[in-house]
C-alpha cells in the first residue's frame, strides 16, 4: 500500500525546506548585534539557531553574544561588563533592529533550494491544494514568496504571527488542514527540522523529513518522520507523479 495514497493536500515549512534563508537571516542578526556593540555570530552559527521564530532567534543570539563578549574580555584581562541593560530589554531592542535589517536584506539573502518551483508546480497541476506553515514573522512571508515567484502555488499561508502557538505545536498545521477542508491525516507535511516533525505528529499528519535543511545540526532521522528524502522532488513519485528532471540552481 502506498503510504500516501489518502493524501488530499500538502503543506510545507519554509526556511530550510523550500528556501535557503540563512544568508539573509545571518546578515540581519549580525547587523543587529553589531549595532549593540556585541560580537557578531556568522552564518555557520546562526544556522543552528533558526527554526523557532524571530523572538527565540534573538534570545539565542543575545545569549551567545553576551557570553562571547565576557570570554573575550576575560582573555584580555578586562573585567566583565556589568552595566548592561536587562537581557529582556536588550532582546526587545535586538528584535527591533533585526526586523529593520532583515527587511532590507531578506530578498537578496534568500534562495530557492533545487527543484522547489517545479515540484510545487507539479503538485498544483495534480489538483492538490498546497499550504505553507512557517514560524517566520508574518510581515516578511508574503513579500518573500512573491520575490521568489512561488506565492502563486499556495492556497493557504500561515506565518509566525498568525497563530498563538508556533510549531512544534500542532495548531498551525491544524489550521491549514481546516482551511483546506481536509482532515489532518489527509494532509502531508514536509519539513527539515524536529519542530516540523513534532508538529506533524501532534497534529496527526503524515510527515516527510528532508535531509538538507538546518535542524540545529541534528540528523532528521532522529525525529522519525514517516519518510526521509534527500531532495524535494523525491516527493513526486510517492504522490503518483513523475520525478522532476528540471535542474534548478540555488540562485535561480
Swiss-Prot record:
Q: Which example biological process does GO assign this protein?
A: carbohydrate metabolic process
Instruction: Locate the active site.
Output: 13 (nucleophile)
Reaction equations catalysed: 2-phosphoglycolate + H2O = glycolate + phosphate
Q: What is its EC number?
A: 3.1.3.18
Annotated binding of Mg(2+), by residue: 13, 15, 192
Which GO CC annotations does the UniProt entry carry? cytosol
Keywords tagged on the record: Carbohydrate metabolism, Chloride, Hydrolase, Magnesium, Metal-binding
Q: List the disulfide bonds.
A: none
Give the source's domain of life in one word: Bacteria
Q: Which cofactor does it need?
A: Mg(2+); chloride
* UniProt key word Magnesium: yes
Query: Which Gene3D superfamilies does the entry mention?
Result: HAD superfamily/HAD-like, Putative phosphatase, domain 2
What's a Gene Ontology MF term here?
metal ion binding
Pathway in which the depicted protein is active:
Organic acid metabolism; glycolate biosynthesis; glycolate from 2-phosphoglycolate: step 1/1
The Swiss-Prot or TrEMBL record describes its family as follows:
Belongs to the HAD-like hydrolase superfamily. CbbY/CbbZ/Gph/YieH family.
UniProt xrefs under PANTHER family: PHOSPHOGLYCOLATE PHOSPHATASE
What biological function has been recorded for the protein in this entry? Specifically catalyzes the dephosphorylation of 2-phosphoglycolate. Is involved in the dissimilation of the intracellular 2-phosphoglycolate formed during the DNA repair of 3'-phosphoglycolate ends, a major class of DNA lesions induced by oxidative stress.
What quaternary arrangement does the UniProt entry report?
Monomer.
Q: What is this protein called?
A: Phosphoglycolate phosphatase
Amino acid at each position: 500500500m502506498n503510504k500516501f495514497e489518502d493524501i488530499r493536500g500538502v503543506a510545507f515549512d519554509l526556511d530550510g525546506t523550500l528556501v535557503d534563508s540563512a544568508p539573509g537571516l545571518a546578515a540581519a542578526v549580525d547587523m543587529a548585534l553589531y549595532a549593540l556593540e556585541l560580537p557578531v555570530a556568522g552564518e555557520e552559527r546562526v544556522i543552528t539557531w533558526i527554526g523557532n521564530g524571530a523572538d527565540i532567534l534573538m534570545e539565542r543570539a543575545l545569549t551567545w553574544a553576551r557570553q562571547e563578549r565576557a570570554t573575550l574580555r576575560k582573555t584580555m584581562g578586562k573585567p566583565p561588563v556589568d552595566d548592561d541593560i536587562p537581557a529582556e530589554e536588550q532582546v526587545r531592542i535586538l528584535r527591533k533592529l533585526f526586523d529593520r535589517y532583515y527587511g532590507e536584506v531578506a530578498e537578496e539573502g534568500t534562495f530557492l533550494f533545487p527543484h522547489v518551483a517545479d515540484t510545487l508546480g507539479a503538485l498544483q497541476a495534480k489538483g492538490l491544494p498546497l499550504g505553507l506553515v512557517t514560524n517566520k514573522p508574518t510581515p516578511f512571508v508574503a513579500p518573500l514568496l512573491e520575490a521568489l515567484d512561488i506565492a502563486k502555488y499556495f492556497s493557504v499561508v500561515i506565518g509566525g504571527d498568525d497563530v498563538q502557538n508556533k510549531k512544534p505545536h500542532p495548531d498551525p498545521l491544524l489550521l491549514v488542514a481546516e482551511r483546506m477542508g481536509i482532515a489532518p491525516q489527509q494532509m502531508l507535511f514536509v519539513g527539515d527540522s524536529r519542530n516540523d516533525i513534532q508538529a506533524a505528529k501532534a497534529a496527526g499528519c503524515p510527515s516527510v523529513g528532508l535531509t538538507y535543511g538546518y535542524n540545529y545540526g541534528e540528523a532528521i532521522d532522529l525525529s522519525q518522520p514517516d519518510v526521509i528524502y534527500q531532495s524535494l522532488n523525491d516527493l513526486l513519485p510517492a504522490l503518483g507523479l513523475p520525478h522532476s528532471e528540471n535542474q534548478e540552481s540555488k540562485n535561480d
